[in-house]
């Protein structure tokens, strides 16, 4: 670290603590904001402060929101009878960007009694007919799906999970065996 530049070093360290930012990139960012474009630096600081102050989880689904209910839960045009369970609010951002789903969400970041009770209340209140699991594929997520299916089997729900298999453009030799196995076992007719 540069001697006598404590504030610069602190900024570099703050950037380097962010995911996917290494020390060289952190130095470039700090230099750009302090020397090359101080207006961008001030704007970034303001935007970070506002995001931290105003973004919170949606009361209903757990998505990122600036209000009690997020835009998705408030949207009258969305399918209100389908609920997609995800692990993180980031997953909602990804699914929304894909424009492949028009229902509601529920962030299941922890599997505990409080979350399960909240999920049950939403299922009943909104008269959900289908529960879609969009979880990272693993033995733990399979166990979670099985547990939730069993817990809510009396609610007359259709349970489904997102398809999995081989990504586009990937050679078979580069696919892990679990994904290849699932792709073969859950193949679709053409």
Curated annotation (Swiss-Prot):
Q: What SUPFAM superfamilies does the entry give?
A: Recombination protein RecR (SSF111304)
Q: Which molecular function terms from Gene Ontology are attached?
A: DNA binding; zinc ion binding
Q: Where is the Toprim domain?
A: 81-167
One GO BP annotation is:
DNA recombination
Q: Does the keyword Zinc apply?
A: yes
Give the UniProt keywords, A-Z: DNA damage, DNA recombination, DNA repair, Metal-binding, Zinc, Zinc-finger
Write out the transmembrane intervals: none
* Chain positions of all zinc fingers (C4-type): 58-73
Q: Has UniProt tagged this entry with the keyword Nucleotide-binding?
A: no
NCBIfam families assigned to the protein according to its UniProt record, in alphabetical order? recR
Q: Which family does it belong to?
A: Belongs to the RecR family.
Q: What does this protein do?
A: May play a role in DNA repair. It seems to be involved in an RecBC-independent recombinational process of DNA repair. It may act with RecF and RecO.
> Which HAMAP family does this chain map to?
RecR
Q: What is this protein called?
A: Recombination protein RecR
Species per Swiss-Prot/TrEMBL record: Campylobacter jejuni subsp. doylei (strain ATCC BAA-1458 / RM4099 / 269.97)
Q: Taxonomic lineage of this organism?
A: Bacteria, Pseudomonadati, Campylobacterota, Epsilonproteobacteria, Campylobacterales
What's the name of its gene? recR
């Amino acid at each position: 670290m540069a001697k006598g530049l404590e504030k610069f070093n602190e900024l570099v360290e703050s950037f380097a603590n962010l995911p996917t930012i290494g020390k060289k990139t952190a130095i470039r960012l700090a230099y750009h904001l302090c020397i090359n474009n101080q207006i961008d630096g001030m704007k970034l600081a303001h935007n970070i402060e506002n995001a931290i102050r105003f973004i919170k989880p949606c009361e209903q689904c757990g998505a990122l929101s600036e209000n009690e209910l997020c835009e998705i839960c408030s949207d009258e045009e969305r399918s209100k009878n389908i609920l997609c369970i995800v692990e993180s609010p980031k997953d909602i951002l990804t699914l929304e960007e894909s424009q492949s789903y028009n229902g509601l969400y529920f962030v299941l970041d922890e599997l505990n009694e409080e979350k399960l009770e909240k999920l049950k209340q939403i299922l009943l209140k909104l008269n959900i007919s289908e529960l879609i699991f969009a979880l990272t594929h693993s033995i733990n997520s399979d166990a979670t799906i099985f547990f939730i299916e069993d817990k809510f089997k009396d609610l007359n729900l259709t349970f489904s999970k997102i398809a999995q298999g081989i990504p586009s453009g990937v050679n078979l030799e580069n696919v892990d065996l679990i994904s290849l196995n699932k792709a073969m076992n859950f193949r679709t007719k053409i």
